[in-house]
Amino acid sequence: MEEIQRYFQLERSHQHDFLYPLIFQEYIYTFAHDRGCNRSILSENPCYENKSSLLIVKRLITRMCQQNHFLISSNDFNQNPFWGRNKNFDFQIISEGFALIVEIPFSLRLRASLEEKKIVTFQNLRSIQAIFPFLEDSFSHLNFVLDISIPHSIHLEILVQTLRYWVKDASSLHLLRFFLNEYCNSNSLITPKKVSSSFSKRNQRFFLFLYNSHVCEYESIFVFLRKQSSHLRSTSSGLLLERIYFYAKMERLVNLFVKVKDFQVNLWLVKEPCMHYVRYQRKSILASKGVSLLINKWKSYLVAFWQWHFSMWFHPRRISINQLSNHSLEFLGYLSSVRMNPSVVRSQILENSFLINNALKKFDTLVPINPLIASLAKAKFCNVLGHPISKPVWADFSDLNIIDRFGHISRNISHYYSGSSXKNSLYRIKYILRLSCARTLARKHKSTVRVFLKRLGSELLEEFLMSEEDVLSLTFPKASSTFWGVYRSRIWYLDIISINDLANHKSKF
């Protein structure tokens, strides 16, 4: 963002955010395209997209300057000369630039707010790297958890109205409304499932911007309740945009609840001295140490709030109440639960000895093996039963390239689940990838797996058998003698880039 600000300066006033002229600047689309290519660590190699031609951008800007497309109705969309022959590609270019432009006032306001009030950070707003240690330290002391599936169905006009509080440029909002109504059905709801694949894949930045603005609006309820009770700890993570939005929400009084009748009178129904809120992408959890009556009141309150504020139906089954001692919580790719760890302590006083049975709560994290195998089967590494198969599409690559692709996926999965309580299930994943790699190489050389391994030796695939302590010793060679004791405890080896794919098992490898 600092690089972009070298080219232009915007007024930092809340009333003068004139973003519309930036849409006609060529360098905006250059920056947007350079930052828009997302790569997946789970993929065999980075994602390389065809860069948009500068000539195409110039022609598109020329059409934008010549046509007053805001006066054209949606019925004339197909005859609109503003769009070129490939209107989807034109929409992709403009949406990338528009998503980058709208983020500018958020960044400027955050920086101005931090400079004026000398605020470095807010201690309860943490990054994705802090979620796992947070769960490990806090969940063993809690009883109930609300497993919330964030409502993502929202009318297009509500999205535009939400952005009005932040983007004061009416022309930019009209352009946003024009895009949404032309690309989607204006009478439908915008949901990740209903949006076409070209919209979700080619316009990820634009789509995430709209979704994050909606999510941060619903999170304002927790900001308000935190002002009422200083013990509400929140952990939220995602794109820079939602972090900026959350900081700004913390610094201004949320008067959203003034219209709710007798809200202050009924606030004590949901006040609780120890609440923990964690969110990642479309899923959030609200954990409490209180009784079941309190957590049920929280559920009823959240359902009523979303239905009233967003004018939409919110099914109560989107929020499930689970007791941590009896149910496993699926979050960030892990199956988490709190189990009792029994221990026997012998106490002796003079000639009398006693055996004291003591049970301690322990935060337990398991690897969801079945969803992982399903993802491997979808990526054609094995069948639905988990039996390894060859990867024919990789048979044309070199031997070292094939081994590197399989090893890359195996290392990422092993590193991500290094904090699991039991890693035995990971050996099955490594076995599938190892044998799939061997069968792919054997297919390439028109041989069998046994003959191929016998000829080249099993050392060819030794990286699949490398244990986690070996990886740590290679990463930190000077302290390798101390890793055996450390390895017995959890080691959260996280990658902020690949976590999006590993936290969602349905993603492609």
UniProtKB/Swiss-Prot annotation:
Key words, A-Z: Chloroplast, mRNA processing, Plastid, RNA-binding, tRNA processing
Pfam entry (one): MatK_N
Origin: domain of life: Eukaryota
Gene Ontology CC terms: chloroplast
Listed InterPro entries: Domain_X (IPR024937), Maturase_MatK (IPR002866), Maturase_MatK_N (IPR024942)
Gene Ontology biological process: mRNA processing; RNA splicing; tRNA processing
Gene Ontology molecular function: RNA binding
Keyword Plastid tagged: yes
Protein's cellular compartments: Plastid, Chloroplast
Role: Usually encoded in the trnK tRNA gene intron. Probably assists in splicing its own and other chloroplast group II introns.
Similarity annotation: Belongs to the intron maturase 2 family. MatK subfamily.
Protein name listed in UniProt: Maturase K
Highest classification ranks of the organism: Eukaryota, Viridiplantae, Streptophyta, Embryophyta, Tracheophyta
